[in-house]
Every structure is written in structure tokens, then in C-alpha cells.
Amino acid sequence: PSTTTDVCKIFKERYSWYKAAKKTEKRWKIPVSVSMAIIKQESSFIADARPERRKLLGFIPWKRVTSARGYAQAVDGTWEMYLNDRGGWFVSRNDFEDSVDFVGWYNYKTHKQLGISVNNARALYLAYHEGRGGYKRGSYRNKPWLLTVADKVQRQADSYQVQYEGCKKKLGKRFIFF
């Protein structure tokens, strides 16, 4: 999208994303604003986002630090668990609908297992980043940079929520003529 700070503009530009995010909210009970804030942080809404490669001898591209990729930056093992739970073929981390559903699925499971509120984007993001086990152990506590990022995700979710409240009726009434 041409902007990533205004969820209404994102959805106006990419209406299919609105439908996918709304479907995820209905299915997993995770607010649109929370899912969108996490995806913004993880990939800046770039479909084929991947972590940088390490450098061998300081300049030769080497292995990536993690298997994370796509809008949701889902790592291989967690993506496989999602596929086993969800079923179906032709699911891709580079597809927005699949990625936002993954984020909803993961955060719903986190909410159920750890009791984190679906509106607490900060805590959900910490569990998303560290894994549920890491969150339970408090691995994020020794990562001040991650706490700063989680605060940023919460602020973005809050901002998206205010914006979304102002445009969701209009988005819901949109008709597409062929």
C-alpha cells in the first residue's frame, strides 16, 4: 500500500485486505487493528519480506538468521502447525489473506493458552515474537529493544482502532460492480 500509517487508506486501496482482516476477526476474535499492527511491524506489508542474511567475512551473503518470511514473518515450524490445524492446500505466507489468518490463529491460541486479552497488542506481540513458551518464561524482559517494539505495536494498534472505527461502516457498505 502507498501508506502504512492509516488503516482506512490501506483498506480503501486494498479492499480484499479489508475483507480478509474482517474474516479473520470474525473467525478468531482478534481485532482487525491488532492483526494489522502486528503485520505492519513484522513485514511493513511486504509480501515476500525476509530477514537479512548474515554476512560471511563481512560481505558475502550467508544464511538467514531465521526461516521467517511473508507478511506475518511466520517461521517454518509454526507455519506447519497452522497448516495442520487449518488444513487446505495452496496456502502461502506471501498471500495477505493467509497471513492475516495465521496472525489471528496464533493470537487466538495465545489468548486461550496464556489468558492475554485479545485487545492487548503489546503482550500478544511479545508472545508472537518470543513464542508462547518464551513469553511464559519472560524471555522478553531482558530485551529492552523488544519491549520498545511491543510498545510501538500497541500504539499502532490503538491508532488503527481509532481510524477503523471511523471508516468501518463505509467499508462494510462498499459494493463492487463487475
Each PLM stretch: what is its role?
Residues 2-171:
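Catalytic glycan-binding domains that act on GlcNAc-containing polysaccharides
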Residues 170-178:
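Gram-negative outer-membrane assembly/targeting C-terminal domains
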